[in-house]
Design a protein with these regions (language model features):
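SEC14/CRAL-TRIO lipid-binding/transfer domains and related phosphoinositide-recognition modules
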Residues: 1-90, 94, 98, 102-132
Length: 132
């Protein structure tokens, strides 16, 4: 397995139900040509968690994300969001988003109006001031 792909998405401990997604590694690895490989890797990790747990959590580190990168990967972000929502309904326990750039927070505030209340309650954007 490609080392960058491993660090892009991994489970910290085999008994854990926390999936870690790190934008730093996504940025180095992701291209339109390997979006399918990334989706399969994320799906495999979620399936491994769900073989031991009824739900999974996600920790997303967005450090280094820029508006141009959001635009560059917009179609992938939309496609994988819909895919995961449809494939794993009601299986997300919690989603923690850390190091989100200011622009993400502004976009999320607008987009969250279109996300159902149950899903909204599962998403927590961790402010930089709250990181110890």
């Amino acid at each position: 397995m490609n080392k960058k792909l491993f660090y892009l998405c991994y489970v910290a401990d085999k008994n854990d139900k926390m999936l870690v997604l790190d934008y730093k590694h996504f940025k180095q690895f992701a291209t339109k040509e390997n979006y399918q490989e990334i989706t399969c890797h994320i799906t495999n990790n979620i399936n491994n968690i769900l073989s031991r747990h009824q739900q999974f959590s996600v920790f997303v580190n967005m450090k280094g994300l820029t508006i141009s990168e959001i635009e560059k990967h917009q179609h992938f972000i939309q496609a994988i969001s819909v895919y995961l929502k449809d494939r794993y309904p009601n299986m997300l326990e919690k989603c923690y988003i850390m190091n989100a750039p200011f622009v993400f927070s502004q976009i999320f505030n607008i987009v969250s109006m279109f996300i159902d209340k149950t899903t909204q309650s599962k998403i927590e954007v961790i402010a930089k001031k709250d990181i110890k």
